[in-house]
Amino acid sequence: MGKNREMRLTHICCCCLLYQLGFLSNGIVSELQFAPDREEWEVVFPALWRREPVDPAGGSGGSADPGWVRGVGGGGSARAQAAGSSREVRSVAPVPLEEPVEGRSESRLRPPPPSEGEEDEELESQELPRGSSGAAALSPGAPASWQPPPPPQPPPSPPPAQHAEPDGDEVLLRIPAFSRDLYLLLRRDGRFLAPRFAVEQRPNPGPGPTGAASAPQPPAPPDAGCFYTGAVLRHPGSLASFSTCGGGLMGFIQLNEDFIFIEPLNDTMAITGHPHRVYRQKRSMEEKVTEKSALHSHYCGIISDKGRPRSRKIAESGRGKRYSYKLPQEYNIETVVVADPAMVSYHGADAARRFILTILNMVFNLFQHKSLSVQVNLRVIKLILLHETPPELYIGHHGEKMLESFCKWQHEEFGKKNDIHLEMSTNWGEDMTSVDAAILITRKDFCVHKDEPCDTVGIAYLSGMCSEKRKCIIAEDNGLNLAFTIAHEMGHNMGINHDNDHPSCADGLHIMSGEWIKGQNLGDVSWSRCSKEDLERFLRSKASNCLLQTNPQSVNSVMVPSKLPGMTYTADEQCQILFGPLASFCQEMQHVICTGLWCKVEGEKECRTKLDPPMDGTDCDLGKWCKAGECTSRTSAPEHLAGEWSLWSPCSRTCSAGISSRERKCPGLDSEARDCNGPRKQYRICENPPCPAGLPGFRDWQCQAYSVRTSSPKHILQWQAVLDEEKPCALFCSPVGKEQPILLSEKVMDGTSCGYQGLDICANGRCQKVGCDGLLGSLAREDHCGVCNGNGKSCKIIKGDFNHTRGAGYVEVLVIPAGARRIKVVEEKPAHSYLALRDAGKQSINSDWKIEHSGAFNLAGTTVHYVRRGLWEKISAKGPTTAPLHLLVLLFQDQNYGLHYEYTIPSDPLPENQSSKAPEPLFMWTHTSWEDCDATCGGGERKTTVSCTKIMSKNISIVDNEKCKYLTKPEPQIRKCNEQPCQTRWMMTEWTPCSRTCGKGMQSRQVACTQQLSNGTLIRARERDCIGPKPASAQRCEGQDCMTVWEAGVWSECSVKCGKGIRHRTVRCTNPRKKCVLSTRPREAEDCEDYSKCYVWRMGDWSKCSITCGKGMQSRVIQCMHKITGRHGNECFSSEKPAAYRPCHLQPCNEKINVNTITSPRLAALTFKCLGDQWPVYCRVIREKNLCQDMRWYQRCCETCRDFYAQKLQQKS
């Protein structure tokens, strides 16, 4: 098995892609790319990620910060920037599979081996190393020279613990993994390590960095600075936990239903880089927990009290009991972790230490999940690495026996104030509490009740924590999944049962699920409601008292920064993270900055977006910032009481109708809607000015924005919206010109219309009914006349059919008059014809032989929706129209199956004595748009345009300012813009003419270093201020006048004789020196047309021979036809006309046939004219049954029977 896998790995490595991982100067990872559409990936992190001490001066120092992490604003951390040169990729030998350990017969089954096409890959990349200063920044384009790094030195002793500035403990990491960009905001977090944490090796191999920490006053945790915790930005509920100890990156990301793992490979040949393995496990709810799959004890062993087996199901009746006192908010589990000799030997002592601490950091974060409602902190006091198995400790296949032995051993070691107590009592005092939990990590494949290997990965005593001889856990090393195993087993040790034991929680996939422990069907990192109640039941019991007896010094003082990320990274810097260093925030979209971050890349005219809002804390207005996609005040709003509504949120759109919402906090533990006595969230319609003409529809805009998000840089794939009637509030998009709808998002943005017609609007992914009165949830509806709550009697319906079947070109169907509503034109069947529509102006659909794609068009004052799916078409418009519309059909030679149209027009006008009073319009001044910035750099201003608007019947339009002359016009709003400093650059004039008109000469130009002022004026600057070398001011040239001209030959005949083709000619330079001017070279080929030989003779098939025996004749049809149109003509050459007749020779006629026994074919042909078989289905059977002799059958199958007689004659002859 190992050899086969190794061969596959070697093959895969030869075709893998490897990309550069780099950093911006502010510590943000700018590029970390993976090969697309793979469940398992490999990436090589550059040498800049190696953890090397760096002093503030740039040389080697004593900082414990990993070299690849730079805290924003922190001191003492290295600055690293990606090298811009190309990289060489080569394959290397793969890491061999795990060897059997102590009689183990096969490799581990958890996690399962990768399937076909998902094998591990190992690559090594040559990186540009650091300069002499250790971790100095490498600028793009630096020389690709390097020296091998010096031999590894033992890390120096860490400095005393210091309180780092909050800004220096966070880093923003960008990972474009699995076809999407993930932005991780990580904070340094070593809270799981106690200040007196120590690592001990038994027996002690001697002094070294991992030797026993026996000093009476050990320093701060030596590994606390290389652990990071955080989440994925804009993904609430996500979790990220990583370690950078040792120079690599190890940990996991939980995002929705995916678990993404990153771990370094053991590649000692990688001198300048660290190969890493990146893979994911996706949650699958397809595996229902059946009776077979519910046997989770196969993977997890739970030992209850001695001699008393634990019940498989937990009674539900006692779970509703509430206790009168409130639980404390924080519990601490002071833990000792032991690694068995097989674990230490497999990884190596130093690597085992880093790996185990990484796992424990992940376990710490699993217990921090808010679903527990109680804070449970893992505090690691000591890590013991066993190089030899103690005589009194049993490590073997029998899991229950091993657990019992380990509990007894740890009690002897830590249960009596000898060892760890004696080391720490000097500083902690004699009242120090005992160890709360002990964990043994082993490489031994064990089984619960059998002395043989099996699939069990963890075993623990149920509710054994704090008990002297039952506070034990054993977990098998199965990679990064070990963190989930330890968290799961610690849950058992704190009295938490499997979710499968609770009928109400058996269907979920949480940490305590029986499926979860396998590591094959991970759910999420939350704890179920049943686990929460089991834990609360344990914490309320006296068995949990030790978790409250925590020494204050064991609480790590690392503080999580409270600063929002948008306060650290401006909008311009966030754009640089998304689109590169030449990007900046698009000032034109300042008014909608919180709904989506729009960026402009230098050199491009249009703004880009990825539809994601900016980071929380980004400035959006004076005294306001963005939070959760909304522009809110920086001053925190007072918390409202339970059940009290919050303020209405800003409108989801800036033009046209949108959605606004408000929420309220609900009483109860779960804050569910049922505790609110009504909905927890309410929505309402908010009106805005109409969107400017010419902009794409809101749904199309979302698709177009997504096209920038997913397209490759070389080929921008444009998308257009496709409406799915079953899921109107999901975003389906199709490439322009193709009918291939793809679901790009489960939810469209709030305020998107549910369809092309109607008022219904999408809110939170659901279509909300909107009445014609503009109220959400209203039952008011327009009648087909367009009257809200009307009776349908104010208009009449005009409908009809158009059945013009054949023709070519545009044919007018009808003219739809002005004032029409509810226009609908539908093809009866798919056809090759095209519907066309045109108003009195220049607006049209499918006119002038130009066929449009599906979309919305503005014609005659209304929005017309055109839909084409294959050959079927539909046109619809709500109206009313302000001008007549001409409906046409573009016909071809194919069949047109007709179309149906209908619309409504107002009924007869009111009598003269009646009048309909028109509603009075409302005029007001509004800020409609922003002017351009008055400076391109150096700081400028931009103002709003104040326009007079007319509001009438909920329609808003811009009118002449005279309408608002009696109103006070507000001052325009002013904002600063383009505050970036103006750059210096070289400016050159045009080259002067060559000094000689023929032959070699010189030409010159003026070169100066210039700088642009804020008003656009260019001034001369010092040459040393310009970047790059000074361009040349003189160059050699050669006069062109003495050069001879090109000589062109005669055009050849056209390449085709019927249609468009190409003709050629020869062009040569007559100058002996061959220095003719290429720009004046005549063309050698051009298009041509020749229709001289379009008519050709077309021949039909030869007919059958005129007789059945002897000599006869055959004929065929000869026609003169046009090659392209297929029309008949008389322009074919008669000399080239093929023959229409030819003789045919069959076998000689046999005159010996007895005419009394068989009907002669000639006689039959004379008496009956054969027009073909009348029963073609049965004629073959009649022939086989020899019924052709009967004249009755012959008449019905004369054609088949002729051949029958011919065979008979041939056989007898």
Curated annotation (Swiss-Prot):
It is found in: Secreted, Extracellular space, Extracellular matrix. Its cofactor is Zn(2+). GO terms for cellular component: extracellular matrix; extracellular region. Residues 49-161, 192-215 are annotated as: Disordered. Residues 120-139 have a biased composition (Low complexity). Residues 1166-1205 form the PLAC domain. Residues 52-71 have a biased composition (Gly residues). The active site is at E489. Residues 28-322 form a propeptide. Its EC number is 3.4.24.-. It is an enzyme of class 3 (hydrolase). GO terms for molecular function: metal ion binding; metalloendopeptidase activity. This is A disintegrin and metalloproteinase with thrombospondin motifs 19. It comes from Homo sapiens. The gene is ADAMTS19.
